[in-house]
A protein has these predicted regions:
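Conserved ABC transporter NBD signature motif
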Residues: 62-73, 78
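Q-loop/switch helix immediately C-terminal to the Walker
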Residues: 95-109
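Catalytic Walker B motif of ABC-type/P-loop ATPase nucleotide-binding domains
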Residues: 161-165
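Helix-to-loop junction immediately C-terminal to a conserved catalytic motif
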Residues: 54
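The feature captures the beta-strand-to-loop junction immediately N-terminal to the Walker
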Residues: 39-41
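A short, flexible loop at the N-terminus of ABC-type nucleotide-binding domains that lies
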Residues: 1-25, 75
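Conserved ABC ATPase "signature" region
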Residues: 102, 106, 114-132
Length: 230
C-alpha cells in the first residue's frame, strides 16, 4: 500500500429520478489512517454513499476526489487502490475463492509466483475459508460468500477499503478476524469507510462516526464513544 491520500467530498448530492436527494450537498473528507463508521436506519443513504465512493453510482452533482483524482472521471486509477465488500453477494460464481483472489492480484499487477499462493492461503485461512478454497463460489453459503468478500477486499493490499455490512452472516471467529484485519489496515495507514448495523465491534476502531438519518439532509458527524481499558 504505497498511496496514502484522503478522500474528499465536495457538495456531493445523489437523487433518483424526481425524488428527494438521498445524499444532499455532503462535504467532508476521510483521512488515511482512519476508519469512519457509517450508521443510521435502513434507507438513510449508507449504501448509496458507499456506492458513490466505489464508483458504482455517479453523483447528481458534486465531486469525490482521491488525492488529485476525480474518482468518477478517472475510475480505473482510483479503483486499483480500493478493496470492496458489497451490500450483496456480487462475486463470480464460476470461480473458486482461490481463483478469485489470484485474479485480483494479477489484475492489479500484485501477483508473483513466489508470494501470491502463500498470501492467498494465509488470508483464506485467516477468514476460515481455506478448506473450501477450491470449491466454486456458487456452492457457498451466504456466510462463506461474505468471507470470500472480506478476503478479496484485503488481498491486493489496498489503500482504501469500502465495506457495506462486512460482519453480516459471519461466525464469531471470522467476525473477530475481520475486525483484526481492519485494525491492522488502519494502523498501517489505510483509509476505511464502513457501514454496519453491528457497531459494537467496530466503534473502538472508528476515528469518526457519521450518522445518516431518515431525512436526506440530516447528516451528523461525531467522535466515537470512548472505551475504557479493562
Amino acid at each position: 500500500m504505497d498511496t496514502k491520500d484522503a478522500l474528499a467530498l465536495d457538495g456531493l448530492t445523489k437523487r433518483y429520478g424526481d425524488g428527494p436527494p438521498v445524499i444532499d450537498d455532503l462535504s467532508r473528507s476521510f483521512a488515511p489512517g482512519s476508519l469512519t463508521l457509517l450508521v443510521g436506519p435502513n434507507g438513510a443513504g449508507k449504501t448509496t454513499l458507499l456506492r458513490l465512493l466505489a464508483v458504482q453510482a455517479y453523483p447528481t452533482s458534486g465531486t469525490v476526489h482521491y488525492g488529485d483524482l476525480d474518482v468518477h472521471d478517472t475510475p480505473y486509477r482510483y479503483l486499483q487502490e480500493v478493496g470492496l465488500v458489497h451490500a450483496g453477494p456480487e462475486l463470480p460464481e464460476h470461480l473458486t475463492a482461490e481463483e478469485l483472489l489470484e485474479w485480483i492480484l494479477r489484475s492489479r499487477e500484485h501477483w508473483t509466483d513466489e508470494e501470491g499462493p502463500s498470501r492467498i492461503s494465509a488470508l483464506l485461512n485467516r477468514v476460515r475459508l481455506d478448506e473450501r478454497r477450491s470449491n466454486l463460489i456458487g456452492t457457498y453459503s451466504s456466510g462463506m460468500v461474505q468471507k470470500a468478500q472480506v478476503a478479496a477486499a484485503f488481498v491486493a493490499e489496498p489503500a482504501v477499503v469500502l465495506m457495506d455490512e462486512p460482519l453480516r452472516s459471519l461466525d464469531t471467529a471470522t467476525s473477530e478476524a475481520t475486525v483484526d484485519l481492519l485494525r491492522a489496515f488502519v494502523e498501517d495507514g489505510g483509509l476505511a469507510v464502513v457501514a454496519s448495523h453491528l457497531t459494537e465491534p467496530l466503534r473502538p476502531l472508528a476515528e469518526d462516526v457519521l450518522r445518516l438519518d431518515d431525512a436526506p439532509t440530516d447528516v451528523t458527524s461525531s467522535p466515537p464513544a470512548q472505551h475504557s481499558s479493562p
